[in-house]
């Protein structure tokens, strides 16, 4: 029987309504260079290991755990030529976008193998090991994030690296206030909730602290409906301070 988190049904339904991230599709490689998705650069930065010489015995094995609409997958393919890439997510709608994104960018031609599959990161025991695991903005949407971290740790090859991104309490205090306010007003995580959430922002006085902070910091990031919903309407998320983060890592 496949494994899943208790929050999987509600989270997958949320991302089927709001495929995320909402970055536009384009023809050709993704823009710019993002070193955190280049395995050679990450290894050189984190452990001081030089890239393997040309003709190394095997390609990098990369897992994109929670790939969403494929923005990270696209970079992972283009920045790691010849790699073997597995990208998984629980949202069918997001994966449909991911497949179209990578097709249009030419990502499959850059790597030895690219698989994009609807699977939980908790259900990958038959895969791996992986030299590099990318999990950005995923574990904090599990009901039991510790189980997700243990599952990813078990998939790492000896000497492998895990690129993990989690929400931080300190960077989200104003977002948490807005989330709590919307929740108390009965704003849901569907299309109606999205409309009401946006209207509430516009109805707040221009001098309101939360509106002002949103307009100064997040307005551009949340222009797309999926990005607004992911930030303010998500049905399942947690965040960490340093102490809880260290305890979380130790739990794996």
Predicted regions and their residues:
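Conserved alpha-helix/loop element of class I SAM-dependent methyltransferases that forms part
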Residues: 27-59, 75
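A short SAM/SAH-binding and catalytic strip from SAM-dependent methyltransferases
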Residues: 131-144
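A short glycine-rich, Lys/Arg-flanked "PGG" loop and its adjoining helix->strand segment in the class I
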Residues: 146-158
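Class I SAM-dependent methyltransferase SAM/SAH-binding core
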Residues: 63, 73-122
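Conserved class I S-adenosyl-L-methionine
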Residues: 59-68, 161-211
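N-terminal, positively charged/glycine-rich alpha-helical extensions of SAM-dependent methyltransferases
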Residues: 1-32
């Amino acid at each position: 029987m496949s494994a899943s988190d208790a929050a999987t049904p509600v989270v997958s339904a949320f991302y089927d309504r709001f495929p995320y991230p909402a970055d536009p599709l384009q023809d050709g490689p993704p823009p710019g260079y993002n070193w955190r998705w280049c395995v050679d650069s990450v290894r050189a930065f984190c452990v001081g290991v030089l890239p393997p010489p040309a003709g190394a015995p095997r390609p990098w094995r990369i897992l994109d755990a929670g790939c969403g609409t494929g923005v990270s997958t696209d970079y992972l393919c283009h920045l790691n030529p010849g790699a073997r890439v597995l990208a998984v997510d629980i949202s069918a709608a997001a994966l449909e976008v991911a497949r179209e994104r990578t097709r249009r960018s030419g990502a499959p031609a850059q790597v030895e193998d690219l698989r994009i599959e609807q699977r939980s990161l908790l259900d990958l025991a038959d895969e791996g090991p992986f030299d590099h695991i990318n999990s950005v903005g995923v574990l904090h949407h599990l009901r039991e994030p510790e189980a997700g971290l243990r599952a990813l740790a078990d998939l790492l090859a000896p000497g492998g690296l895990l690129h993990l991104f989690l929400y931080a309490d300190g960077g989200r205090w104003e977002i948490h206030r807005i989330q709590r306010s919307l929740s108390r007003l009965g704003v849901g995580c569907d299309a109606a909730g999205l409309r009401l959430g946006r209207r509430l922002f516009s109805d707040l006085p221009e001098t309101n602290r939360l509106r002002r902070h949103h307009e100064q910091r997040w307005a551009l990031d949340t222009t797309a409906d999926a990005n607004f919903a992911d930030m303010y309407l998500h049905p399942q998320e947690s965040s960490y301070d340093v102490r809880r983060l260290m305890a979380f890592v130790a739990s794996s």
